[in-house]
Design a protein with these regions (language model features):
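NAD-dependent ADP-ribosyltransferases
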Residues: 1-156
Length: 156
């Protein structure tokens, strides 16, 4: 795997917010009842949707088609859209109807992924992103995410 995403964080002076060895703290991911009914993994690239009466929710990652294969684009920025899968360092209380899952601190991060810390608040949940380091087939991205999924536990 390349070090391109690491260099982006290093050049921006944000290397302290880039992790590719171990999960830096307990992270939480909410799963909606709809996602659960569909049997979707907890960590998966949401394709986006348009909630009734609200602006569209963009896809988690950019997916392009190359020779008939769906390819996830590797993250190359510290901010913006299509960076990866959202997680938080605490549950978000106003997200009703979600079941929360915890990814424990010190869980090894698969070699094709990085976790980035996108905010640094003391008084509210901080956003973290599970990002693809490089372009890869969508199916392979899910394999790497599944390596983290197996460490998730349902939070009480």
């Amino acid at each position: 795997m390349s070090e391109a995403l690491r260099r982006v964080y290093e050049e921006a002076g944000l290397l302290k917010y880039y992790f590719d060895k171990d999960v830096p703290c307990d992270l939480f991911r909410g799963q909606s009842a709809t996602e659960a009914k569909k049997g979707l993994p907890i960590l998966y690239p949401n394709p986006g949707f348009t909630p009734k009466g609200k602006p569209p929710r963009l896809p988690d990652v950019e997916i392009v088609e190359v020779n008939g294969k769906k390819i996830v684009k590797g993250c190359r920025t510290t901010r913006g859209d299509y960076r990866g899968i959202s997680t938080f360092d605490r549950k978000i209380p106003n997200l009703g109807g979600f079941t929360w899952y915890q990814l424990p601190k010190a869980t090894p991060i698969p070699e094709a992924l990085a976790i980035t810390q996108d905010s640094d608040y003391a008084d509210r949940p901080n956003h973290f992103t599970v990002a693809p380091k490089d372009d890869m087939p969508l199916e392979l991205f899910q394999v790497w995410l599944d390596a983290l999924n197996k460490h998730l536990t349902k939070d009480a």
